[in-house]
Amino acid sequence: MDFGAYFAGFVDGEGCFTVSFSPRSKLLIGWEVRPSFSVSQNADRSEVLVVMQQYFGCGSIRPDRSDRTLKYEVRRLDDLVERIIPFFEAKPLLSSKQRDFERFAEVCKLVHNQAHRTQSGLREIVSLAMSMNASGKRKFGTEAIFPTGAEVIVSAISNDGRKRSSDPHEWRNDLSAVSTRGSAKLNWP
């Protein structure tokens, strides 16, 4: 049996390529980028997940409490870049999920090349990720990652690389030398 073709078809119906973002104050840019590939099944059909894990030689199977299923998931970047992406490049998906895969692969390559550690690289990654899985839910959207309100103005004005509180009442010390009257032209990152 050609497990590769079977898995490609199975993933076309039951799989998901996602990119999630988590705030991490210890990181230079302040956000962690987490690409992952997953396939969910009810517990009574979990055998296919075990065979898939053995076939790819990576990932883990865990319960997903949100929908009471089991999930085969690959999150390790090297496994995604060296095993999962080459597999789906060789065996393209037939549904609109192929477009999501192509964007997912681009995100993984950008992260692998450390682009997520720069403002412009993170913007490109966020743009690609937000164009994937249109029906999916996101905990953090573009506005949360790149706020356009006063927080951006404070970071643009201070420009010394220090993290700032998101509480406007704590900005006084940082803005004491900045006039809030008149117009100021800011160069957005």
Task: List each model region and its residues.
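Sequence-level preference for short, compositionally simple segments enriched
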Residues: 1-189
